[in-house]
Amino acid sequence: MAKLSNDELIEAFKELTLIELSDFVKKFEEVFEVTAAAPVAAAAAPGAAAPAEEVEEKTAFDVILEAAGDKKIQVIKEVRALTSLGLGEAKALVDGAPKAVLEGANKEAADKAKAQLEAAGATVTVK
């Protein structure tokens, strides 16, 4: 039997009906003792959903100051109000953005801090 190129095989498959192609796949699986890959992909989907559930159950959040914005002095004041930092330390934190303002805060405290910092003109993310 002559060896067919990939292009020749594709052209041969194009001429088959769906039923003939399905029969070919079944015969191919029997002869080479393989199965379709679809069940493997279906088994991987539930595993991918598990990390999303863990994120929803997260209880400790970090408030990250991404940028101070135009009102840098107001942002420094808010950082001082949210933390126990002195003026120099708060200024260094704001100048060194992106940096964490709060770490390990609960959801309510993190959202409150984010709102206060954004009201002062900062760009903030909660992780």
From Swiss-Prot:
CDD domains for this protein: Ribosomal_L7_L12
Instruction: Give the InterPro entries listed for this entry.
Output: Ribosomal_bL12 (IPR000206), Ribosomal_bL12_C (IPR013823), Ribosomal_bL12_C/ClpS-like (IPR014719), Ribosomal_bL12_oligo (IPR008932), Ribosomal_bL12_oligo_N_sf (IPR036235)
Alphabetically ordered keywords of this record:
Ribonucleoprotein, Ribosomal protein
Signal peptide positions are none
Keyword rRNA-binding among record annotations = no
Q: Which superkingdom heads the taxonomic lineage of this protein's source?
A: Bacteria
GO annotations of cellular component type:
cytosolic large ribosomal subunit
Question: Which GO biological-process labels does this protein carry?
Answer: translation
The terms under GO molecular function for this entry are:
mRNA binding; structural constituent of ribosome
Family statement drawn from the similarity comment of this UniProt entry: Belongs to the bacterial ribosomal protein bL12 family.
Q: What does this protein do?
A: Forms part of the ribosomal stalk which helps the ribosome interact with GTP-bound translation factors. Is thus essential for accurate translation.
Q: Could you tell me which PANTHER family the record lists for this protein?
A: 39S RIBOSOMAL PROTEIN L12, LARGE RIBOSOMAL SUBUNIT PROTEIN BL12M
Q: How does it assemble?
A: Homodimer. Part of the ribosomal stalk of the 50S ribosomal subunit. Forms a multimeric L10(L12)X complex, where L10 forms an elongated spine to which 2 to 4 L12 dimers bind in a sequential fashion. Binds GTP-bound translation factors.
* Protein name per the record: Large ribosomal subunit protein bL12
Please give the organism.
Answer: Clavibacter michiganensis subsp. michiganensis (strain NCPPB 382)
